[in-house]
Amino acid sequence: LYDEKGKKLELDQSVYKDLGLSTPTNPYNAELCVNRGIFAMLNEAVRALVDDKIVEKAEEVDLAMIMGTGFPPFKGGLMKYADSIGTRKITDELLRFADDVGPRFKPAESLMKMADGNEKFYDKF
């Protein structure tokens, strides 16, 4: 959340009291929350692009994500964003998420192979 001047706002802790809830003991980690959602989408996009060949090019995934889900265009789309992060970091994070919260975050085999070769989506597809 941002105020009218564009300054990022912090989570209002009084919300917990208003809802009759206790304050969480673990700190809120915005990056973790964002990455968990983005990397899960990316894992599925890899399956659509590489494994199932539903789309032929990384830019088709990006266009669909920007136009269909509102993925931020300034990031270049989901696959371009993934290229900027790197497949190794993405697979490492997905493996950590799989350990923490379950197998639905297990990286696609094709993504792990790309990470082993440090490949980029826009170079390969």
Functional labels for PLM-detected ranges:
Residues 1-125:
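N-terminal glycine-rich phosphate-binding loop for ADP-containing cofactors
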